[in-house]
Curated annotation (Swiss-Prot):
Catalytic residues (positions): 472 (proton acceptor)
Chain segments carrying region Legume-lectin like: 24-262
Domain of life the protein comes from: Eukaryota
Keyword Nucleotide-binding annotated: yes
Leader sequence residues: 1-22
Membrane topology: Single-pass type I membrane protein
Record-level Gene Ontology MF annotations: ATP binding; carbohydrate binding; protein serine kinase activity; protein serine/threonine kinase activity
Role according to the record: Required during pollen development. Involved in resistance response to the pathogenic bacteria Pseudomonas syringae.
Subcellular location: Cell membrane
Sequence similarity: In the C-terminal section; belongs to the protein kinase superfamily. Ser/Thr protein kinase family.
Top enzyme category: transferase
Entry protein name: L-type lectin-domain containing receptor kinase IV.2
Regions that span the bilayer: 292-312
Organism per entry: Arabidopsis thaliana (Mouse-ear cress)
Length: 677
């Protein structure tokens, strides 16, 4: 029993000795003379024959590490407290350029023997892009940084900082020391001279002190940098101590001359007289390359910068845009010109869909969404381009109707006006009506298109928040989607006015053959002038003929409204239908009704024309069209159709008296038609 007790006591005493030895670990290197079995060298780190630990050489963008191979028990496993520690060392930095170096040196306490994934340059071999600043690093370091890195908040290119898990220092100061008169003296880290450092951590006050001084000076009374922080959350139980360094683009060498360390006590003083001397540094002689080559390179660089600036300015002008106050509310629908330029492949002629008096239209594919669009680029010679463009933006930007061509957005640059529409794959209606088209529309398709356009025009007149006068209803402005549904487009001539107010338009704008007589006289556009144009459109779709045709051979002018009206007077109105429709397979009564409705909408008296609400009722069969009956036409009454010889003063029998039940009065339309707006 006594023997067992003696063995237990001996084992306990041995453990205490080992713990005490670990808790008071210390070592001193007055130079690093090979072989160094207890120091691990990594990266560029080597030992010179005279005992200098050379962390880096003149290689660029490299790291060098030197760590003591013995693990040090920094933290008490029972209470979690970090032990006090102290270290002192002497280092020097040699640079090929006296005023510039890269990138510095750091004393490190790390959880691993080396830092294999650390980066060079501004990361000083401590961290990389992904782990910089992570709490899981468990790295304490004091950096002696010779390059200012703004991303880490460095104050300058000659500073000392305390780093905890990252390169954004917890505290820092310009490198220097306070002399015996308490006056701060700057100290250049790249002076090519030996510099001595003291780093102390007190586990009771949790104070970290970093003191710096020239090689041959005593330790200053005041530290350069201090910081209070309990390192128990930073350091693990077992850690390694050592140094890290890194190079950047400037050729630099980092030397460690001597080093001592102690746990739970003050680090032993270095024997300065025994420390190895630095290699003699001689400045390089300026070669012929620097005398001749550098000026040539500089000159080439200047020309390159000028060319680059010219290219940037030219490119900026190429995609330059304009933005005015009125565009603010439509900002979300604004396209960049660069995007439209690439979408249309530079507005190539092969992507040109059409060209008119108001502008040219190009097919394009938006790079981001791959959406097919039609980009209308307004011609430079458009006299009222800006006004028309603004009207279009305001009227279409917020509209949403299945029979209107959606306006996706717009762009403006240096006087150019661009509108971006949803692309309609089947193009405009007119190409299916004239010039022997390859594809002929049957009556069902034409009827669907007519009803769709009527619905869209009714939306503009009565269903939207403001009255919108289209002013250019015609077959070429009706676009067909993939299912041959008619969509009313080209709002470049649209005008808005509030419900109940007079339209303030004074310019005669539109297309010959679709202009109402009163529009030619007064220059004012109203919903009734749109109805007149829609009447011409109805006759156009049913007959397959243009509202006006000039025959140069006979010097005659064909007026579609006049022709259909004359056929109706003779009782042969069905002769006006398009021969391509054939004679069967569709509702002939519906065709006749549409022709008569076209005449009614083309009435010379705007009060006699139906509203678009009534037009829809007729087309949908919700209300019967009033019967048209010829009366005595010998009274000589005439109507101005706005069709021939400048569309003023065309004599034509006035059929305002041929409708059954016509009595005249303040509202002719109300006496003729039921319903209303």
């Amino acid at each position: 029993m006594f023997v067992k007790l003696k063995l237990i006591f001996f084992f306990f005493l041995l453990c205490q000795i080992m713990i005490s030895s670990s808790q008071n670990l210390n070592f001193t290197y007055n130079g690093f003379h090979p072989p160094l079995t207890d120091i691990s060298l990594q990266g560029l780190a080597t030992v010179t024959p005279n005992g200098l630990l050379k962390l880096t050489n003149t290689s660029v963008q490299k790291t060098g590490h030197a760590f003591c191979t013995e693990r040090i028990r920094f933290k008490d496993s029972q209470n979690g407290n970090v032990s006090s520690f102290s270290t002192t060392f002497v280092f020097a930095i040699h640079s090929q350029i006296p005023t510039l170096s890269g990138h510095g040196i750091a004393f490190v306490v790390a959880p691993t023997l080396g830092l294999p994934f650390a980066l060079p340059s501004q990361y000083i071999g401590l961290f990389n892009i992904s782990n910089n600043g992570n709490d899981t690093n468990h790295i304490f370091a004091v950096e002696f940084d010779t390059i200012q890195s703004s991303e880490f908040g460095d104050p300058n290119d000659n500073h000392v900082g305390i780093d905890l898990n990252g390169l954004r220092s917890a505290n820092y100061s310009t490198a220097g020391y306070r002399d015996d008169h308490d006056k701060f003296q700057n100290l250049s880290l790249i002076s090519r001279k030996r510099i001595q450092v003291w780093i102390d951590y007190d586990n009771r006050s949790h104070r970290i002190d970093v003191t710096v001084a020239p090689f041959d000076s005593d330790k200053p009374r005041k530290p350069l940098v201090s910081y209070v922080r309990d390192l128990s959350s930073i350091l693990l139980e077992d850690m390694y101590v050592g140094f890290s360094s890194a190079t950047g683009s400037v050729l630099s060498e980092h030397f460690l001359v001597g080093w001592s360390f102690r746990l739970n006590g003050e680090a032993p003083m270095l024997s300065l007289s025994k420390l190895p001397k630095l290699p003699r540094f001689e400045p390089r002689r300026i070669s012929e390359f620097y005398k001749i080559g550098m000026p040539l390179i500089s000159l080439s660089l200047i020309f390159s910068i000028i060319f680059l600036a010219f290219y940037i300015v030219r490119r900026k002008k190429k995609y330059e845009e304009e933005l005015d106050d009125w565009e603010t509310e439509f900002g979300k629908n604004r396209f960049r010109f660069k995007e439209l330029y690439h979408a249309t492949k530079g507005f190539k002629e092969k992507d040109l869909l059409g060209s008119g008096g108001f502008g040219r239209v190009y097919r394009g594919i938006l790079p981001t969404t791959k959406l097919e669009v039609a980009v209308k680029r307004v011609s430079h010679d458009s006299k009222q381009g800006m006004k028309e463009f603004v009207a279009e933006i305001v009227s279409i930007g917020r509209m949403s109707h299945r029979n209107l061509v959606p306006l996706l957005g717009y762009c403006r640059r240096r006087g150019e006006l661009l509108l971006v529409y949803d692309y309609m794959p089947n193009g405009s209606l007119d190409k299916y009506l004239y010039n022997n088209p390859e594809t002929t529309l049957d009556w069902k398709q034409r009827s669907t298109i007519i009803k769709g356009v009527a619905s869209g025009l009714f939306y503009l007149h009565e269903e939207w928040e403001q009255v919108v006068i289209h002013r250019d209803v015609k077959a070429s402005n009706v676009l067909l989607d993939a299912d041959f549904n008619g969509r009313l487009g080209d709002f470049g001539l649209a005008r808005l006015y509030d419900h109940g107010s007079d339209p303030q338009t004074t310019h005669v704008v539109g297309t010959l053959g679709y202009l109402a007589p009163e529009h030619s006289r007064t220059g004012r556009a109203t919903t009734t002038t749109d109805v007149y144009a829609f009447g011409a459109f109805l006759l156009e779709v049913v007959s397959g003929r243009r509202p006006i045709e000039f025959h140069s051979a006979s010097d005659d002018t064909f007026l579609l409204v006049e022709w259909v009206f004359s056929l109706w007077l003779r009782g042969n109105i069905m002769e006006a239908k398009d021969p391509k429709l054939g004679s069967s397979g569709y509702d002939l009564e519906e065709v006749e009704m549409v022709l008569k409705l076209g005449l009614l909408c083309s009435h010379s008296d705007p009060r006699a024309r139906p509203s678009m609400r009534q037009v829809l009722q007729y087309l949908r069969g919700d209300m019967a069209l009033p019967e048209l009956t010829p009366l005595d036409l010998s009274a000589g009454s005439v109507m101005n159709l706005g069709g021939r010889d400048g569309f003023s003063g065309i004599a034509m029998t006035d059929f305002s008296t041929v409708f059954k039940g016509f009595t005249g009065g303040s509202s002719i339309a109300d006496s003729l038609l039921s319903g209303g707006r």
